[in-house]
């Protein structure tokens, strides 16, 4: 199916929502790298096997036969407690799930709607049935990670069902390229890769270059030891980052983009490839996107494990097939980046913020974080601390609050 207009996108969203509403129960199995390493794939397979035969079990228990969906999601955040599972519509959060627990989950929760209480997270010896009951989760503000752990990480339909690509459509049909840049500039969004350079200023510098060929590049080479924020976004909601890149390309007049992913992220590469293929099949990437006349082609480039390739000029050199070596600046990438052309280079988290800003507006973004740096920041917590995992908190949150 090709989506060739804003109306088509709205119709597709309604269709997918209707299909999802038809499920009486959805089992969300965390399938981020951490949970997969803990055995989540076997749990997914066992739940799928048991739910295939659920009709016989339900009849035996004299219960109505539920319509069940088994879903692979991205990271659900509580990485030290994996494998993790959420059950909709009850919003139960299970931790330390094992294959031997699956039958009980099906019989009690999937069929009867009852909790398996021993699988709940416990805080100060009190059970926390729902994510909203867990202090580690309920104190977060999620923009970048809002879909991670909630939608199928391998389904573009589920991304569309939660408003996916609506921001892109709004940018194309309701805003000029300069209007997009102005909104990003007004939002105060800063690059989330470390330097904190204003994203709108960078886009504006590329847009005003006389050279007509321009590129949009995403830095997914997350090389800091123990960091897995960008990897979790690429694994859990690759579509949001892709949508942000398309909006950036529209704003600066680019028709080609590259995602540079570190070699140690094979699952990210796999899901990004799936996401790109699905978007192309729907007409949401490629030529004449949404019937707008706008073209944007997206490519994946795998790094070779060199830490230095996280630096912008080294990264672009690596994409070009050269040795990844930083160069003296100026010129900067906004002037002469990939193949000597003006290039927007932001990281995964920066692009993932863009769709929400376009939809909700710069003023909304300013209500979160600090005056000088609005919005949120994702962090991966590792080491000898109380909670390890993935979080997203407003800018200005103290390290003491995050760690302890």
What do these predicted ranges mean?
Residues 237-251:
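Histidine-anchored nucleotide/phosphate-binding helix
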Residues 31-36, 90-91, 256-269, 273, ...:
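Conserved short loop/turn motifs at secondary-structure junctions
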Residues 140, 269-395:
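Hydrophobic alpha-helical positions that pack around
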Residues 169-210, 367, 392:
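Accessory "access/gating" subregions that flank catalytic or transport cores
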Residues 50-51, 244-248, 394-404:
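Short amphipathic, charge-patterned alpha-helical segments
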Residues 1-29, 37-72, 88-186, 254-259, ...:
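Iron-sulfur (Fe-S) cluster-binding modules
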Residues 31-39, 80, 184-206, 305-317, ...:
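Conserved phosphate/anionic-ligand binding catalytic regions in large, soluble enzymes, centered on
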Residues 151-166, 218-230, 333-338, 380-385:
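Gly-rich Lys/Arg/Thr-decorated short loops/hinges at beta-loop-alpha junctions or inter-strand turns
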């Amino acid at each position: 199916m090709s989506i060739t207009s804003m109306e088509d996108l709205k119709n597709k969203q309604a269709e997918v929502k209707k299909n999802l509403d038809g499920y009486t129960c959805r089992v969300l199995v965390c399938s981020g790298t951490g949970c997969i390493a803990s055995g989540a794939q076997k749990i997914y397979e066992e739940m799928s096997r048991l739910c295939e035969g659920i009709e016989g079990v339900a009849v035996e228990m004299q219960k109505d036969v539920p319509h069940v969906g088994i879903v692979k999601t991205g990271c659900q955040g509580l990485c030290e407690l994996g494998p993790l599972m959420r059950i909709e519509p009850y919003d139960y959060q299970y931790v330390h799930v094992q294959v031997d627990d699956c039958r009980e989950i099906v019989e009690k929760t999937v069929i009867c709607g009852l909790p398996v209480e021993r699988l709940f997270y416990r805080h100060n010896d009190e059970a926390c049935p729902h994510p909203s009951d867990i202090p580690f989760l309920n104190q977060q503000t999620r923009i970048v990670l809002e879909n991670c752990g909630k939608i199928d990480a391998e389904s573009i339909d589920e991304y569309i069902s939660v408003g996916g690509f609506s921001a892109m459509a709004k940018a194309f049909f309701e805003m000029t390229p300069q209007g997009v840049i102005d909104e990003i500039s007004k939002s105060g969004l800063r690059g989330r890769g470390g330097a904190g350079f204003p994203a709108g200023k960078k886009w504006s510098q590329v847009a005003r270059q006389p050279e007509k060929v321009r590129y949009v590049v995403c830095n997914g080479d997350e090389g800091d030891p123990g960091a897995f924020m960008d990897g979790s976004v690429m694994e859990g909601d690759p579509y949001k980052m892709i949508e942000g890149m398309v909006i950036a390309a529209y704003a600066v007049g680019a028709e080609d983009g590259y995602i540079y992913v570190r070699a140690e992220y094979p699952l990210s590469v796999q899901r990004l490839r799936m996401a790109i293929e699905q978007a192309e099949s729907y007409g949401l990437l490629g030529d004449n996107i949404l019937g707008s006349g706008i073209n944007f082609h997206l490519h994946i480039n795998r790094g070779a494990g060199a830490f230095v390739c996280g630096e912008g000029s080294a990264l672009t050199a690596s994409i070009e097939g050269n040795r990844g070596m930083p160069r003296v600046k100026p010129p900067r990438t906004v002037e002469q980046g990939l193949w000597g052309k003006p290039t927007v280079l932001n990281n995964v988290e920066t692009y993932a913020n863009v769709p929400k800003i376009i939809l909700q507006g710069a003023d909304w973004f300013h209500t979160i974080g600090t005056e000088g740096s609005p919005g949120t920041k994702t962090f991966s917590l590792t080491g000898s601390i109380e909670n390890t995992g993935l979080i997203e908190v407003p800018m200005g949150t103290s390290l003491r609050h995050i760690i302890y």
